[in-house]
Amino acid sequence: MKFSEQWVREWVNPAVNTEQLCDQITMLGLEVDGVEAVAGEFNGVVVGEVVECAQHPDADKLRVTKVNVGGERLLDIVCGAPNCRQGLKVACAIEGAVLPGDFKIKKTKLRGQPSEGMLCSYRELGMSEDHSGIIELPADAPVGKDFREYLILDDKEIEISLTPNRADCLSIAGVAREIGVVNQLAVTEPAINPVPVTSDEKVAINVLAPEACPRYLLRSVKNVNVNAETPVWMKEKLRRCGIRSIDPIVDITNFVLLELGQPMHAFDAAKLAQPVQVRFAADGEELVLLDGTTAKLQSNTLVIADQTGPLAMAGIFGGQASGVNAQTKDVILEAAFFAPLAITGRARQYGLHTDSSHRFERGVDFELQHKAMERATSLLVEICGGEVGEICEVVSETHLPKLNKVQLRRSKLDALLGHHIETETVTEIFHRLGLPVSYENEVWTVTSASWRFDIEIEEDLIEEIARIYGYNSIPNNAPLAHLSMREHHESDLELSRIKLALVGNDFHEAITYSFVDPKLQSILHPEQAVWILPNPISSEMSAMRVSLLTGLLGAVVYNQNRQQNRVRLFETGLRFIPDESAEFGIRQELVFAAVMTGSRLSEHWASKAEPADFFDLKGYIENLLSLTKAGPYIKFVAKEFPAFHPGQSAAIVLDGEEIGYIGQLHPMAAQKLGINGKAFACELIVDKVAERNVANAKEISKFPANKRDLALVVAENIAASDILDACREVAGSKLTQVNLFDVYQGQGVPEGHKSLAISLTIQDTEKTLEEDDINAVISVVLSELKDRFNAYLRD
């Protein structure tokens, strides 16, 4: 919003200069974007009167004038403006004057005729870009008076940027109110008295949408002179606020808009078929706007209409058919309160943005309409004359906004500000803001004002106190925080340790969205119920993920499409499983997931490129699980999953509970997802492996270790991990290590069987083991394996 400093000072005039005033406005939360002079730097320009005006003898477009500037004689001035005429009051730059751009006025001759000055246009004085003619001043302008003094041009245009909640400051009254509060000065409002009714003319009103228009006022003014001249003081105030003068009717409604913040409109009474209706548009209705464009109205658009159809978009734009023009004799003034939600977004639907819509969609004072109507009527009668009818009003008290009562606790105020403000000071600030307040039991009860739609919660009141008390008056105190060390159990396995282990194996951490494409998710989890968002960002992000793999595999596709074939990614995050027994019907689980594609090792001159396989990923996960307390008890049990290859997938099981899964992505699933080549993936619940093995010191044997290799033949459906576990169970403390180092099927091994080569390391902490001791351990192991798995030594 742009406004004139001088206009504001007519309402409230603090003893501060322009710079200090702008600082105050900014600290009030009304950020000052710019300050400009309302006119260029010039001197020597006075009010003059064209006494004579004749055609230049040698130039068709020039006129020779004699101008009275209050001196002893008339000045001869040659002028080329088309509107120069006898009797006109003008801005005259006399000899010695200096205009903007250091342009000096001297006596000269133009086409042979003497010229002792210059009649100025707005552009030549740096007041606007208007160069269509010379400035025309009122007939009562005092001849000889300094032009700067006459128009009070030692003024500044101040432009402020307002947040949407401060629509109350979209007017001179609103800005003055704020300045008055911070300077503890009373605001001097112009006298606005009821205009005497001189006509019995009434306007019939029918409000069909009271929820959208709780208050609607119309007033008839007959026999107005729409061709009257807008006073120069009004033109100047409008100009300094960035609004061009059009005609007195429009200028008056714009003036009231800027002064009080109430948008108004004027209809040509002769073009209305009463009653005037306030209703929503019917689909397909059309309205020709004042700018000549045609709007095809939508059913959610509030309109002002009569018996013939729409007259205007309510609170947005007037219609051409009912607009005021040079032939208008009788006008109907409109002032209304339109509910913000009824106007919000409607202008943008039609590619419009007007001063009225800007204010109505943010909220206008719902008690301002009568005052604005009287102000506009008074100005209209003063400038254009006319016979005034009574104000016709329809109001729905039920739908008018209710004043909020908000409580503010002393403890909350002190806590948020970090500073104690005296109770009397706080109460006084509320009174200065025009907010009724009471104080009892360390609590202020504040009633919002009709112009403040944004006072709703306790924090809003604290903001008001801080603004008016002054942010600079609140001391800078370092934040006081009562911190306590987070309890950390020695057995807790930090998530960062898991991540570092994977990073050490050439994996990269990824972060993907919790919102996923339900179509892609159904490829991986066709049987899993999912949580669909009611208002998604897009259709591709409309479901909550039930697995991290949906996002990770999408990241694989993204990288492969950019020529990255060897991809290793992992992620930790929440998955969301619909569960009626859980809070809000959804179970959130922290899980870990990893995916792997491409070669086993990075490209290197000393090694041959080999594709990664299921056992590579399984090895990485086993290495990861070895960090946990649960590691020795976790088993990989063959199991089929819909999205995995049936021969290369397994459940990760701990104490009989399935805590995750691992496998190669099914070729069909990979094809649907757009993945090239084989992809391997796993996922497991973090909480199940969140404990680590606490370091336990034990004696290191000083006696030699003995290694024995066994080649065992077992049925091919027996897991090697079961063989290794059985060895550990029966061999006792002397068995320090057992490893699988070869798997063989083929010649020499019966069909349906496989040969597992395992290495046993046997060692004692108290003596060197004899061969008999070693053989005893081997014998126990072989006996157990034969009994449990029908295993025997391969020949």
From Swiss-Prot:
Q: List the disulfide bonds.
A: none
tRNA-binding domain segment(s): 39-148
Choose one Gene Ontology CC annotation of this protein and give it. phenylalanine-tRNA ligase complex
Q: Which InterPro entries match?
A: aa-tRNA-synth_II/BPL/LPL, B3/B4_tRNA-bd, DNA-bd_dom_put_sf, Fdx_antiC-bd, Fdx_antiC-bd_sf, NA-bd_OB-fold, Phe-tRNA-ligase_IIc_bsu, Phe-tRNA-ligase_IIc_bsu_bact
> Which cofactors must be present for this protein to function?
Mg(2+)
Which EC class is this protein assigned?
Answer: ligase
How is the cofactor bound, in the record's words?
A: Binds 2 magnesium ions per tetramer.
| Cleaved signal peptide residues | none
One GO molecular function term?
Answer: ATP binding
Catalytic activity reported: tRNA(Phe) + L-phenylalanine + ATP = L-phenylalanyl-tRNA(Phe) + AMP + diphosphate + H(+)
Q: Name one GO biological process term.
A: phenylalanyl-tRNA aminoacylation
Q: How does it assemble?
A: Tetramer of two alpha and two beta subunits.
What's the family? Answer: Belongs to the phenylalanyl-tRNA synthetase beta subunit family. Type 1 subfamily.
Give the PANTHER family listed for this entry: PHENYLALANINE--TRNA LIGASE BETA SUBUNIT, PHENYLALANYL-TRNA SYNTHETASE BETA CHAIN AND LEUCINE-RICH REPEAT-CONTAINING PROTEIN 47
NCBIfam families, alphabetized: pheT_bact (TIGR00472), YtpR (NF045760)
Q: Specify the protein name.
A: Phenylalanine--tRNA ligase beta subunit
